[in-house]
């Protein structure tokens, strides 16, 4: 039986979301409302997953807020039995992992609010592209969802359930066909979707998670190393590395590559705590290793 459950939560794949709040720091009431409602939508889907897990006999459920600056889930609206990992993503690198404590005795991974990888024609706000090449000649194109599945696989942990847009759910099921899933919306384009009701989504997540955690144990999705990782991004400061570092495991290779992404370069392991963590305040451009030709990654 699955006793200790780890949830990774993103926001773009929740039912009812079709685009973010505005990114120009506009301080309008509309922008405030967009951000507030998206946070509520995610928090309630996480609560639904927690209810399903506890109904299936879980003893501990921890959720990692993995969207943006890691401050999207609203703590005061959380199920009281949940524990929350939140905060600045770049400081994970000092721990050597993208998901803190995942290797500390957890039995199953749940994915909530997942979105499709960059380049997906029918994905809601698709972004992030992680390319993996193994020494054995295998290649993978991962989304953030399947990336989390692979990190869990390095810890021997299976992914039991995923909720998100249809494109990312189908992508994840192609790698782990036995897990339970919920497609919260069908996407026509990056900001045009047909969504189910958030109320229905929460009901289906709760029942789906309970069913998933009552089934026989699945095999983890594991990428066999050694391997190397490249990260694609339309931001020209994120280079497509010519010779990424080869590491023994996927998780190690991912961390090695993330250390070269501009906004994943924290100034200090121990920050002074008096600066609001605006992720746009990154290393000055003069310190970025941009090729003289100005070439961008594919």
Describe these PLM feature segments.
Residues 3-27, 38-42:
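N-terminal glycine-rich anion-binding loops that anchor highly charged ligand groups
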Residues 8-9, 64-65, 109-114, 162-163, ...:
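Short beta-strand segments
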Residues 16-21, 33, 40, 44-104:
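Glycine-rich nucleotide/cofactor/substrate-binding loop typically near the N-terminus or early
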Residues 19-37, 127-137:
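A solvent-exposed, charged loop/short amphipathic helix patch at secondary-structure junctions
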Residues 80-96, 134, 141, 179-190:
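Acidic, His- and aromatic-enriched active-site or binding-groove loops in soluble protein domains
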Residues 92-94, 129-155, 163-167:
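Active-site glycine-rich loop that binds ribose-phosphate moieties when present
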Residues 151-212:
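Active-site rim beta-loop-alpha module in soluble metabolic enzymes
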Residues 201-298:
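C-terminal accessory domains and tails appended to enzymatic cores
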